[in-house]
């Protein structure tokens, strides 16, 4: 009887430990951090104590940080030097680094994929060499600074292509050649161990869109093959389309894994604490989740469970939880942050990362 009494609590603790560490990557994108700090913003933990944001994240279960990298931004925001500085802090806090290469001087997304200044817009051979050399330069710079990189995404939300006009979706062979060149910029770099290479699309819930892109780019007759990349990343936002259900996300992730054999991650997602005037109806199987701090916890746990229950599902990243100067985060909702924008204090929802 005594043995059973002792064993049962141990089993409970073991099960809890396994449940709280089911995802390999429990992450956040905090690319804006250095810009926020330059504006005088300081962050507080849930107890109101001022601390570096990276330490607050780590204490709440975050183990990886996503960083967007721009090529030649006019003001230096998110350029290579900026990201080396941020990554050194991330590593010092004990978290891994995931670089999100935009291959642009500014935002890259389904509506914007502007080729950097000085890169070719009329010759694909020249452009692919520029992509290869730039990608290798980024990786080599991190290596020379002693910074390990866990993941490199070759493009950001590239369902509609990248590096326009040459990489528009009217020419999937060009897209494939660009991605192949980027992948080998990582592979031929001096980073050791080598990062995992990711392709990242938006609308992760839309299996037909995901399948269309990968089937076209892998059958274009160009250089890209499945062995060029390791991971498939998707964005999953609940406030842009009522069809973005959890059920649809589940189907899409499972199909991506079974069709292409890659590990899968949700690399951008958010949930609002305030959304008085949403531009679109929320998906039907999310309507029971309140727009609140508690709702953020519930939403992240549900998405994380879907990822964890997908064969090869290994990670979730929350997009910009602490960008207090941009609480809407580009959406029609008023506030998607896990840090209070007025007090700069971490909300209790931030601790959800310790549970996924």
Swiss-Prot record:
Single GO term (MF): glucosidase activity
Recorded catalytic activity of this chain's protein: The enzyme specifically hydrolyzes (1->4)-beta-D-galactosidic linkages in type I arabinogalactans
Signal peptide: 1-21
This protein's record includes keyword Oxidoreductase: no
GO biological process: cell wall organization; pectin catabolic process
Enzyme class, broadest EC rank: hydrolase
Pfam families for the chain: Glyco_hydro_53
InterPro entries: Glyco_hydro_53, Glycoside_hydrolase_SF
GO cellular component, one term: extracellular region
Family listed: Belongs to the glycosyl hydrolase 53 family.
Function: Endogalactanase involved in the degradation of plant cell wall polysaccharides, and more particularly of hairy regions of pectin.
Protein name: Probable arabinogalactan endo-beta-1,4-galactanase A
Organism in which the protein naturally occurs: Aspergillus fumigatus (strain ATCC MYA-4609 / CBS 101355 / FGSC A1100 / Af293)
Gene transcribed to yield this protein: galA
